Amino acid sequence: MISIIIPTYNNLELFKRAYNSVISQDEKEVEVIVVDDSTTNDIQNYCLNLPVRYHHNSPALGAVKNWNSGLKLAKGEFIILMHHDEALKNKNFISSLLHCFKNGYDVVVSNIEVHLGNSVRKGLCPNWLKRLFIAHSYLLFVRNLVGPCACIAFKKEYIKYFDENLKWVVDLEWYYRLMNKRKVVFMQSNWITSMHGHKGQITMNLDICNQAKIDSMYIFDKYEHNIKVRCSLFVKKLVSRIVKLIR
């Protein structure tokens, strides 16, 4: 069985989209866990008659703690954490993942399709480059070429929890720990769709530049003895400075 955790916050329509993408799958042995930080009862009421494990946080936990609370509830052998603004695009998404796991992989990375207004962007980079970054996951600290959390599926035995000291690069640091020293495969035919630009999007509510600096300093200290991570952070900083000079 695979557990799909859906953290939610005050957006019933996006939650419906995420949930419907799960129940339309050809693989039906799925545990759906909804961890709700909402200030309204809309999602709670909608879930009353659904075959889901629903938990409402009162008071709200905040984004990262809410994600961790969902991970702790998972009972499946495999896990996906899918935010309410994400969805599984292809109906064989889960069965394709399970095939990879049966072939001995520990982590499966899927492709990403970003929706922003009327525009759609498929993929973040060439597939060969994504495979390179996945094979050497410390490179993700230079740039996120994976996408959102739903692009990662993993065996529960290798579960990692989000570092609650982080905000902006919390997902990247989590990806690194999940993939480091594991057998990872990129499934380019599996697609996650991600809705950007909506009011509740976490990145819309952060001072990104300031938070990125705070997170980078924290990671630099956390990985004091990891030269690859530290070098990746240095390269990211160098590239950012070059881009500013060009502009």
Where are these regions (language model features)?
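N-proximal low-complexity "stem/linker" segments adjacent to membrane-targeting elements
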Residues: 1-21
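Short, acidic, metal-binding catalytic loop of nucleotide-sugar glycosyltransferases
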Residues: 20-29
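Conserved nucleotide-sugar donor-binding catalytic segment
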Residues: 128-209
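Glycine-rich, basic loop-to-helix element that forms the pyrophosphate-binding segment
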Residues: 57-74
